[in-house]
Amino acid sequence: MTTYYRLEQQIIDWHNARNLIEGSTDHQQFDKLLEEVEELRVNIEHSQDFSDDVGDILVVLINLCERHNLTLTDCMNVAYNDIKYRTGKMVDGIFVKDLIDESGVIQDAV
């Protein structure tokens, strides 16, 4: 199996070979991302394998990152640092974060 970093570089090379970094826009790639997310939703709804859909989403996200000199790892680090101390609770199977008001007091999640 190919390592993550090698595979990420192969995907970047694939994008460049097809002019999908310089020849596309963030908005076009966002539209593509929504298309891939919809395919994921359909396969989840029908209890079908969705590994290709997740992979396609990652391919588009790598494109968006590359055009802004980021990596998925960079973005995951930012996201993790944002959530690592987050508090909240589960509501209908989804984690809802507590809110912090202007005075810095934590308000319980809905």
Predicted features by range, described:
Residues M1-V54, L58-V110:
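Flexible "arm" and connector segments at domain edges
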